């Protein structure tokens, strides 16, 4: 229907064994996943391990979120015909995937191994999942409201990374309020020339002065390949990572997920990651 046709499921996450998950802004498409020479995107995800998944925590939040998406009327099986597996084209595709995996495993042996990821992660004080409504119609901008309040309550700094900036007056006003309260307030986004989204780059070029007028400092990324990370650094103990772009589609139309992580170690690690890109801006 016309009032639903623009709704999109924009979340990106993978849950394993009900106790570990990856969540971020990375699409499952070739140039989001690989290191290709001609075209690729730079992205960011976060790995979360829950040692006690029976308790109320972010993994239980995410599992409940998945179940609610799965059960709603707008979701349906693409097909349930097991006979498709007997088609020659399907068998050929399955064989090709098996062969490509063997080639990958042989070329990248260092990536195929069992690992205790708890040795490579940091213990956090708290992780909270923030989400938009999941229906396909126009949405209350829950994620935007939540992020806005987190940023307004920062004591010293807020650093945003987003591939796109397409705001309305309410969103500009939120940033203006943050700028009044926070001395170090900046955003890094793709320059118009470096942006892989022509609509996003056109709106940014047209409204850049409006963004500057909010009081935020802008860094334009010029790394040659489009930057696709969506993150917010707040003071020295809060990190926000997920799928939400600083645009009206993420605010009002799409399903979106952002993780709010309270941890000084994660904050420091995220800052180091953000700065590698800001050096090219």
Regions found by a protein language model. Name each.
Residues 1-12, 16-281:
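Charged, low-complexity intrinsically disordered terminal segments
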């Amino acid at each position: 229907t016309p009032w639903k046709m623009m709704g999109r499921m924009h979340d990106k996450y993978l849950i394993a064994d009900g106790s570990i998950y990856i969540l971020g802004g990375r699409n499952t498409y070739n140039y989001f996943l690989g290191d290709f020479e001609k075209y690729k995107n730079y992205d960011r995800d976060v790995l979360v391990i829950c040692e006690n998944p029976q308790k109320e925590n972010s993994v239980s939040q995410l599992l409940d979120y998945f179940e609610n998406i799965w059960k709603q009327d707008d979701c349906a099986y693409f097909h349930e015909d097991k006979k498709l597996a007997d088609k020659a084209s399907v068998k050929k595709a399955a064989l090709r995937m098996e062969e490509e995996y063997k080639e990958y495993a042989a070329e990248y042996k260092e990536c195929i191994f069992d690992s205790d990821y708890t040795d490579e992660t940091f213990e956090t004080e708290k992780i909270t999942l923030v989400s938009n409504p999941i229906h396909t119609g126009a949405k209350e901008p829950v994620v935007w409201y939540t992020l806005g309040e987190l940023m307004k309550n920062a004591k010293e700094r807020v650093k945003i990374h987003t591939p796109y900036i397409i705001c309305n007056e309410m969103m500009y006003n939120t940033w203006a309020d943050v700028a009044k309260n926070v001395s170090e307030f900046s955003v890094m986004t793709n320059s118009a020339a470096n942006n892989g989204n022509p609509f996003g780059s056109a709106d940014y070029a047209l409204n850049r002065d409006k963004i500057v007028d909010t009081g935020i400092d802008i860094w334009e990324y010029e790394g040659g390949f489009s930057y696709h990370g969506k993150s917010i650094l707040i003071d020295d103990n809060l990190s926000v990572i997920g799928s939400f772009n600083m645009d009206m589609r993420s605010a009002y139309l799409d399903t979106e997920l952002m993780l709010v992580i309270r941890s000084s170690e994660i904050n420091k690690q995220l800052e180091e990651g953000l700065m590698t890109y800001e050096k090219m801006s």
